[in-house]
């Protein structure tokens, strides 16, 4: 197992790919806005798409969100708030994911889900305490490999990965917001920065 602190340049990309080609498990970090964005970034740094597709197993993207403190305020989304959310994510996908997670019943809509807001206290003036990750896990399947070889855009790779079941960071954040771990506002703040 080889850990590369961060891949920033062509030389580091080349070393990581060569190590992976010789059978080493290589773990590294890379600065991108999404899991799918890592692939064009590697290509921009000089990695050949056929080498990326044969050496990459999975990409995990993460952002840290603040955790709600124990004192929090319960609320439900208005129709207007749901309409505003559609500019950040697919409301239908979020609804389906919440149903799969048993956070929403079959006949219910997103407006029926209880979400939580921060509540200021003496101990936690902003209503938050600690942090946790929201994640996007992109497995490199055969169809994703062929998109890599075709030099497809991050958007095309993301779209295909979502069709194959990948949950985006926003969607993962919504699950955690519905569980009362963080707030929708915090999720949107972090993913739109």
Where are these regions (language model features)?
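Short, flexible helix-loop junctions that flank or precede catalytic/ligand sites
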Residues: 1-193
């Amino acid at each position: 197992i080889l850990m590369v602190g961060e891949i920033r340049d062509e030389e580091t990309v080349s070393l990581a790919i060569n190590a992976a080609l010789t059978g080493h498990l290589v773990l590294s970090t890379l600065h991108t806005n999404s899991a799918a964005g890592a692939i064009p970034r590697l290509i921009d740094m000089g990695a050949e798409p056929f080498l990326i597709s044969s050496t990459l197993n999975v990409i995990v993207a993460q952002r840290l969100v603040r955790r709600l403190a124990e004192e929090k305020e319960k609320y439900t989304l208005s129709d207007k708030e749901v309409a505003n959310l559609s500019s950040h994510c697919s409301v239908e996908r979020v609804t389906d994911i919440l149903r799969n997670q048993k956070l929403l019943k079959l006949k219910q809509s997103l407006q029926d889900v209880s979400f939580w807001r921060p509540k200021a206290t003496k101990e936690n003036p902003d209503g938050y305490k600690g942090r946790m990750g929201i994640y996007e896990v992109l497995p490199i399947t055969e169809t994703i490999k062929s998109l890599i070889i075709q030099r497809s855009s991050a958007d095309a790779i993301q779209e295909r990965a979502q069709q194959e079941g990948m949950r985006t960071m926003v969607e993962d954040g919504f699950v955690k917001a519905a569980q009362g771990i963080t707030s929708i506002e915090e999720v949107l703040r972090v993913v739109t920065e």
